[in-house]
Amino acid sequence: MLSLETLDLLLAITEGELIEEMIIGMLAAPQLSIFFKKFPAIRRALDRDLPRWKLQLKERLHEAMVPPALAQEFYRYQQCQLENNTQFFHNLNDTLDLLRQLVSPFYEQARSLVDAADLPNHPLDDSFQTLFLQRWRISLTLQATMMHHQLLEQEREQLMAELQERLALSGALEPLLSENDTAAGRLWDMSKGHLQRGDYQRLVEYGNFLQQQPELKKLAQQLGRSYQAKAVQQQDALPEPFRVMVQVPATLPEEVSGIHQSDDILRLLPPELVTLGIEELEFEFYRRLLEKRLLSYRLQGDVWQEQIHIRQVTHQQQDQQPRGPFIVCVDTSGSMGGFNEQCAKAFCLALLRIALADNRRCYIMLFANQIVHYELTAASGIEQAVRFLGQHFRGGTDLAACLNATVSKMTESGWFDADAVIISDFIAQRLPEEIIKKVKQQQQNHQQRFHAVAMSNYGKPGIMRIFDHIWRFDTGLKSRLMRRWRR
């Protein structure tokens, strides 16, 4: 069997231009142009995905097999290329019969070339063979190109259907989850799953609910954007230059403070200069000059001068803590049902929006009688988010098991710098000392943070004492009415 890649190589056909033309034509569709004007961030995310599409289309074309008739015709064409003039004319009728049997598009043109050449009445030369093979090559190239177009048209229909589904999903969720180009790109990658409109409509409903609770959205923003600096002490004390200002005698002092012996010619007393003019005392003058015993004025004065010393220095610097992933634990007990359940799910949706924008991971754990896991930023994150939002809160409260699972997750690779967020009303039994010890160990040794989102003012203070920060959002009727009144 002859592959299309081999045929392209032998006929010097480049499929890159055909693929480029197909993609440009597909994206130029009027409905897509209108959509991209409305959501430019999704268009930029799609543009980053185009090289992968082109590579996939190229691989599919290479994997395609040439039809047997076209392959047999091409093999015959290669044989004719290797034949000399005598062999070519001897096998010409067999070649025409083969083209007729294969129903080749070149058959009629080949028959016309043979009839026009009037071979019985003209001498046999190489010009006819060259012309015949050139026209045959053009016909084979056209057939291969048509095959490319047919395959690309099939791929175009499939790609267009997939594109419309993903654009519909991304367009519906873009106002909800996309905050910047990073979020739009990750949302586009997550839209590969096969979801119907009814599947992701629940996401839109909770997004609308979140818009109706601006205080809850603001609380999620404060928690998600919060960070603190780490004090990091260097292990080795390295020698570094240390600059100090010291007071030293001036090079050109100006204040006279007395008389002393020296060799300073400029500050000599007049009697000493007189001895230099007496011939008998001249040698005595030079002797005293060498011995620095000439009487001269004493001048004094101080200046401040910078001196550099080398000393061992140990730094303790404040580094901004990197924003790691979220591990969100949601209480699914009966007391968290109703409005509390809506707020908890909407809060997780707000954290997902922040995680997408900051290129972080968002991991959800539901704790009741058993722990259920969802990673909302995975490749199948939208499908998992739909399943999470469809979960009902009717279990018990097992906060100890949740914290234990959270600590275990935070010790795994890729989760060392994670932030733990516990969403609950914290109406539960006291925590075992072993769990409290594990949480404090993570806080002290790894500087990992544990946040509590309290949905009730009646949570037990003894339980919430272990958290680094407590974010309160009371869902009681009085608090709800007060928040609505303030708006």
UniProtKB/Swiss-Prot annotation:
Entry's localization field: Cytoplasm
Pfam families documented for this protein: VWA_CoxE
CDD domains: VWA_YIEM_type
Keywords linked to the UniProt accession: Chaperone, Cytoplasm
Domain of life: Bacteria
Subunit structure: Homodimer. Interacts with RavA.
HAMAP family: ViaA
Name listed for the protein in its UniProt record: Regulatory protein ViaA
Organism: Serratia proteamaculans (strain 568)
Gene: viaA
